[in-house]
Amino acid sequence: QARESGAMVMNLPYNMGIGSAVQSGFLFAKEKGYHFAVQVDGDGQHPTSEIPRLLSALDNGVDLAIGSRFVQPTEYRPTLTRSLGIKIFTFLVCLIVGKKIYDTTSGFRAASRKAILLLTEKYPHDYPEVEALITRHRNEMHFVEIPVELNSRQAGRSSIGAKNAVYYMLKVTLAVFIAIIKRRQR
């Protein structure tokens, strides 16, 4: 459907995970000399009509614009498990970056050229959104949240199902604690 709409579509040889897929997109953007890159999930939930608002933030000197589900009240209601995970990650990331972030797990993001260059080198491979925020913070990049209202899921299912929810929580929490330890060692 994306190709039919005129989008360039990258076919990877096999399922390498979300982090590798996103990093491949950043590598493509770097090689083509793009000034901005926009990340959207493939399930149709992210309103592409909001992309200009994210890009506008980048035009104003921000390195990352996050399409946020929580910065303002919306109709979006995550499951109880997902809501708990988001709250835990948000609390931990806020400890590290020193400012309130409402949606640390949003996959709807726009990145500046500076962020593209960083993320081609340093991008987590499993469930990368939270870790990528910390990486950007460590590299003194500025980010902002733009309120968005999600569409209902049009296709597919979440990559974080019942089977791997515990793995996801442990892996990301461990990565955040490592980031906290590294920060204190500086």
Descriptions of predicted regions:
Residues 1-5:
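Acidic helix N-cap motif at the loop->helix transition within catalytic regions
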Residues 8, 12-31, 36, 48-126, ...:
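Acceptor/aglycone-binding surface of glycosyltransferases and processive sugar-polymer synthases
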Residues 42:
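Cys/His-dense Zn2+-coordinating finger/ribbon modules
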Residues 45:
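Glycine/small-residue-rich loop that forms an oxyanion/phosphate-binding "nest" at active or ligand-binding sites
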Residues 99-100, 121-124, 134-151:
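Catalytic donor-sugar/metal-binding loop of nucleotide-sugar-dependent glycosyltransferases
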Residues 131:
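Cell-envelope/extracellular polymer assembly enzymes that use nucleotide-activated donors
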Residues 171-186:
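C-terminal, non-catalytic tails of nucleotide-sugar-dependent glycosyltransferases
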